Amino acid sequence: IIRVLRAQGLTNLVTRSHRELELTDQAQVREFFSTEKIDQVYLAAARVGGIHANNTYPAEFIYDNMMVQANVVHEAWKSGVHKLLFLGSSCIYPRLAEQPIREEYLMSGALEPTNEPYAMAKIAGIKLCESYNRQYGTDYRSVMPTNLYGPGDNYHPENSHVIPALIRRFHEAKAGAAPEVVIWGSGRPMREFLYVDDMAEASVYVM
């Protein structure tokens, strides 16, 4: 998103890394919004990871994401931010939803068990934006990207997503002359992937 905005000639961008601003800390988020003069917010921050991370740390996935969303949305509203874009996840839809998935399928069935806590947090983020819009007249929008890939991805073996995880496994197998590469699952499910810059352009357009 930053690359797209800069390519459009915008220079007044305010960013913070996780080390600079802990979004689960309401006091820090309140101080940030009271100090900076923000008119639009792209809420892309989240605790994310693959199947292993979601299975291992379900409490962190639901708590951290709900805290980040609640703090940013609430403090943005309190400081007068009228426009906000919340990036959710396609895992909010039921595991057995009819294909192609339609927006109205949200909360119409059971979620995928492996990432249910993360999905519940993202659903809460959507409802948070809808509730502030209804009560306070804000323009807080939600978009649900599918599996993203591209520059700046995370290749950590514990919490990477499927494409960087596979790239790392094949690279390490090649470098170590391994006789095989283990890939989880049956190989039958179909996955959808979206290039990160395409998602960024769509996010700026929706905002």
Each language-model region and where it sits:
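NAD(P)H-binding glycine-rich loop region in Rossmannoid oxidoreductase-like domains
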Residues: 26-66, 75-78
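Adenosine-cofactor binding site in Rossmann-like domains, unifying the SAM/SAH pocket
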Residues: 6-32
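NAD(P)-dependent short-chain dehydrogenase/reductase
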Residues: 96-105, 130-207
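Conserved Rossmann-fold NAD(P)-dependent oxidoreductase catalytic core, especially the SDR/UDP-sugar
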Residues: 70-115, 141
